Regions:
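Periplasmic N-terminal accessory/gating domains of Gram-negative outer-membrane beta-barrel systems
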Residues: 3-109, 120, 126-127
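A generic structural signal for short coil/turn motifs at secondary-structure boundaries
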Residues: 33, 131-134
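Predominantly transmembrane beta-strands of Gram-negative outer membrane beta-barrel pores used
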Residues: 73, 101-112, 118-126, 133-184
Length: 185
């Protein structure tokens, strides 16, 4: 009599998740890319990715796979942001220094995000440093930014404060004050 031993082995799977059309954006990448007037912008960085376009230089809206900006869902820590652009559409409202992570879902949007047909941009804010105080900032052609973070109670509670300030009011006020009747009817 002969003895036969049969063994089987599952093939090694390199693909663990079938979710496609997802862009994970590192804030380090956003800060390293050349920026319009020296201001790092998450939306401008996303416009460099496949399937995402802009409507021109003066527009920060996301046009994902043919959809318009109103067809995108923008979330910041699970809260909906209804108007993610400012400064006449040149920049998004998000300070890259205060954002921890950013995920753009361009297709196959999960049901939990319902209501938008173009994309979902899900961003998470940074948490403050619980061990040491840190300060960072920058000066650009039209704005400056600063971020401060540190422990309130070491290893238990922390703070982070981040802000941007533009110089455009100083540049435009003298011009606007000279115009006595800027609109003719």
């Amino acid at each position: 009599t002969a003895e036969v031993l049969v063994t089987g082995r599952k093939a090694d799977r390199n693909i663990e998740d079938a979710q496609t059309s997802v862009i994970e954006l590192e804030m380090k990448t956003v800060k390293e890319l050349p920026a319009l007037l020296g201001e790092a912008d998450i939306f401008r960085t996303l416009q460099l990715k496949p399937g995402v376009a802009s409507a021109g230089e003066g527009n920060s809206g996301l046009y994902v796979r043919g959809g318009g900006p109103s067809q995108n869902l923008v979330l910041l820590d699970n809260a909906t942001v209804y108007n993610p652009g400012h400064l006449l559409g040149f920049f998004s409202v998000f300070n890259a220094d205060a954002i921890k992570s950013s995920t753009l879902i361009k297709g196959g949007i999960p049901a939990e995000y319902g209501g938008r047909i173009s994309s979902v941009l899900d961003m998470t804010m940074r948490e403050g440093n619980m061990k040491a105080y840190e300060f960072e900032g920058g000066i650009g052609a039209i704005s400056s930014r600063i971020t401060a973070q540190g422990p309130i109670i070491k290893d238990k509670a922390a703070f982070i404060v981040s802000g941007r300030f533009t110089y455009l009011s100083f540049l435009l006020n003298p011009i606007l004050e000279r115009q006595e009747n800027p609109v003719s009817i």
